[in-house]
Amino acid sequence: RATGDVHLYGKEINDETYAICKSDMMIKGNNPENIRVGSTLSTDEFAGTTFDFMLSTPPYGKSWSSEQKYIKDGKDVIDPRFKITLKNYWGVEEDADAIPRSSDGQLLFLMEMVNKMKPKHQSHSGSRIASVHNGSSLFTGDAGGGESNIRRYIIENDLLEAIIQMPNNLFYNTGITTYIWLLS
């Protein structure tokens, strides 16, 4: 049980789910204004805000091509949430492509949360993330491509705590294998 104040925040694209969440927040005495409706990828409703704990189940295989114009302008990444720096072979830092294929945005949702992590010097324990994914976040993308660079960034910055494979049939009416990514 939490000993301090707990403030809940969230964003939901589905209007019905948004309404249920907002009403649930009111019933339980939480601030319903902290729940926003819309696309997490196209607008950063909580820009500049960091969180202690973050949970998500990004949509599996959801195309984000309709939101590409908010994230990338041609070859340039324009949204700072999705910009990363990696070291090359000689140890020189370089900007790297961190944009996955437009047919699956799961890793973009993960990078959104990584962007909202508290630095360890700001909080005694930093932040913790639990995000439920299917296998594509682990296995897709070519070396040097967006998916590979995101995974590399997470590992090189020592953010990955564990990836837990869950039993099949965890979600109703599907046999998709799921994994929980734990970051801190």
Each model region followed by its residue ranges:
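Conserved S-adenosyl-L-methionine
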Residues: 1-56, 60-76, 107, 134-136, ...
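Compositionally biased, intrinsically disordered/low-complexity regions enriched for serine, proline
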Residues: 55-56, 77, 97, 164
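Surface-exposed acidic, glycine/proline-enriched linker/cap segments
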Residues: 24, 75-99, 109
